[in-house]
Amino acid sequence: MDVLSYLVFFLVVAGIYAVATLGLNLQWGFTGIMNVGVVGFFGVGAYTAAYVTGPNYPDAFGGFGLHPLVGYLAAMVVSGAVAFVVGLPTIRLKHDFLAIGTFGIAICIQLVAMNWKSATRGFDGLHSLPKPFAAAAGSPFAANLAYLVMVVAIILLVTLALERMVRSPWGRMLRAVREDETASAALGKDAFRVRLQTFVMGSGLMGLSGALYANFTGFVSPQDLLPIFTFQVFVMLVVGGSGNNWGAILGAVVIWGLWTATETVLSALLPPGLQQQVAAVRIVMVGLILVAMLLLRPQGLLPERRNVSPEARLKP
């Protein structure tokens, strides 16, 4: 039962990462938007869900005590709204400058979470967040299993919706903007509008992943907003296959599996004097996996599929 409980826990966390990776895939994989502030929008979603669903805190804002599903919707809306405000002045920036700008936004969000204690309680965090199905399940294992089913259902709904979107004319326009923004603009396509749309929608999915995380763990604090989260999501997308939604999901499961496995293996192999270096060594190992993947299979485990319009397929 312990192994099964851990497997369910592992898959829930991998699913939460998969939702964030799908959001990044929409931005970077399909549109070429270099968003290095993934963890910032994840944090906005997590705190929004905590405010909407959490108990009344005497020393902080929030405590509406609404159903977690309401929290998930609110997290997507608020994260998307923040992305819209951020994207208006920054989305025109080129790759390097946009990466710096989004990274700076993520750092600002973390600093706000750390220092605005009347709203976030600082490092004390927002606690006692409700988990869906916990009361009806009867046991922690059953509650986690029900949560896993819900996360898988959300992933399938999001993936099917994204697949339908990227196969549409709008999806082909995303690829056109990604490949050559200037040529797309010359053909009458509003590249700024397209990039802003995908930035908002992708950030909304990142906010949803934060909400799922907050209600699963029952706690959120600035410690959950570390830049390593963004690194993990990028590695997941590169390994799984940029531009492929199913590849994004596969990459999330594979990299999270390697991330957790390396911690167990390194803890067993390293001598006691080096146990404090397990986290650093693990990051190095995952970085080496990323480099190897870029050298040996840059298209990822599941490469991007060619998308041809029906009209083009009918031409001789």
Identify the role of each PLM range.
Residues M1-P316:
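Transmembrane alpha-helices and adjacent helix-loop boundaries
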